[in-house]
Amino acid sequence: FADSTGLLYAHGTTYYGLKQRGNLQQGETLLVLGAGGHVGLSAVEIGKLMGARVIAAASTEEKLDLCRERGADETINYAEENLKDRAKELTGGAGVDVVYDVVGGDYAEQALRAIGWAGRFLVIGFTAGIPSIPLNLTLLKSCQIVGVFYGAMTARDPELANEIAEDLLQWVDSGELRPHISATYGLEGAAQALRSLMDRKSIGKIVIEP
């Protein structure tokens, strides 16, 4: 139960974003913001399965340790390092090919400034607030800002949604993909689980079992 909970939503969002919306190619560099959360961590895992070089960015070393365990090639602690400068340094100044942004806020512009020529910036969420971005950056870098709304896609294109589910389940069956569960609560612990999410203390996924 715990392993399957949320798989299709979080990992479905990621796979749809990276494959269909971001056109991530083998050998490209993927920068994941909010990489310590459930959705961000799924991007680290699936990015590696798709053959990308993955740079995981998160706010604590504990979260980054987990990202490294899950396959991240490089990490950035954006609570202590300048996100743009470090990402550019890790790519030899070229910038990243794809940004997977769960965070938004002030980090979104930093990540966009770290993107390379003809890069793709995937808008996934706004845990740090809805960002304001200078659109001239898209012209200067000839890059794309692309929204990823997996829930709406499943209703509009159920055939594609089924294909995504089949690919994900094949990875699960082969043992290549297994969602990380940071904590499991009973119904009586639901309030504590929600507090952990709101305080951004959780790493990976929290499951509430009936």
Regions from the PLM with identified roles:
Residues 197-204:
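Glycine/proline-rich active-site loop of Rossmann-fold NAD(P)-dependent oxidoreductases
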Residues 99-100, 122:
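N-terminal Rossmann-like NAD(P) cofactor-binding module of classical short-chain dehydrogenase/reductase
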Residues 26-28, 96, 118:
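Phosphate-coordination loops involved in phosphoryl transfer and adenosine-cofactor binding
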Residues 1-81:
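Mid-domain Rossmann-like dinucleotide-binding core that forms the NAD(H)/NADP(H) cofactor-binding site
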Residues 34-35, 103, 126:
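NAD(P)H cofactor-binding loop motif with strongest signal on the N-terminal glycine-rich segment
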Residues 82-93:
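Short amphipathic alpha-helix with an adjacent loop that forms part of the alpha/beta core around
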